[in-house]
Amino acid sequence: FPTVSLPGAAVWHVPWTEKDDGLDWQAYFHQRNRWVAALLHSPYPRGASFPKTSLASDVRALLSLQYYSADLRRQGLKDVLLGPGHLHPSMHTRAAEARAKAKEYTDARLMTEAADFPAVHRKKPAPVGTKPDSRAQFISKAIAGITKQFLPEGEHREDRVEDVLSSTDARWWRLANLNSALVSNAEGSGAWRYQRDAKHYRRALAESIALHAELIRR
C-alpha cells in the first residue's frame, strides 16, 4: 500500500505487554499457524528444536493453570494433523468455536465487577515463586511444579482463592505452586479465576505429548 508522511502526527498502538492474545481464542491460531509455517519453511529435519519448544509451551500453559489456551493449542495441533484440506472449510468457523469454548473455563471468563471477585483466603502465606536464575533451578522448579499438578487439589470453594496476581506476575513458577488464584488481565479491566484441576492436567498433558509425538512421527 502507498504511504504518506504526516508531520506532527503519530500513531498509537497498544504495547505488547498489554495484550493477552496468547491466552484468548487467538491461542489456537498462534499454535496452528506456527506449525504450518514450520512444516512449509523449516530447512531442518523434523523442525529441529521446534517440536520441543512447542511442547514446552503447552507444559508452561498447564503449569500456569491456563487450561483454556492450552486446550486451544492442542486443537491447533489436531487440525495440523488433518492436513491442508481442513484450512479452507474451517476458515469461517474456528474463531467462533474457540470463543465459544471459553464458557467452559473459569480461566477464560473475565470478571469485570469487583463484587464478583472471590476473596483471598490462606491458611498460611501463599508460596512466593521466584524466577529461576540458573538451569539447575529451572529444572528443579519445573519438576516440583509438574509433580504438584498430580496431587489432589484440596478444598475447593468458589468464593475463595489463595492469591491475587497481576498479569506480569502470573508466571508458571508462581502459579504452579498454587491451587487457585485471581489473575488480572494485561490492561487491568478485569480478572480471571485460575483453578488447579489435577485430573484435567493429567489428561491434557498426555494428549499434548501424544499429539507432538504423532507430528514428529509423520
Regions from the PLM with identified roles:
Residues R32-R218:
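Terminal low-complexity segments of carbohydrate-biosynthetic enzymes
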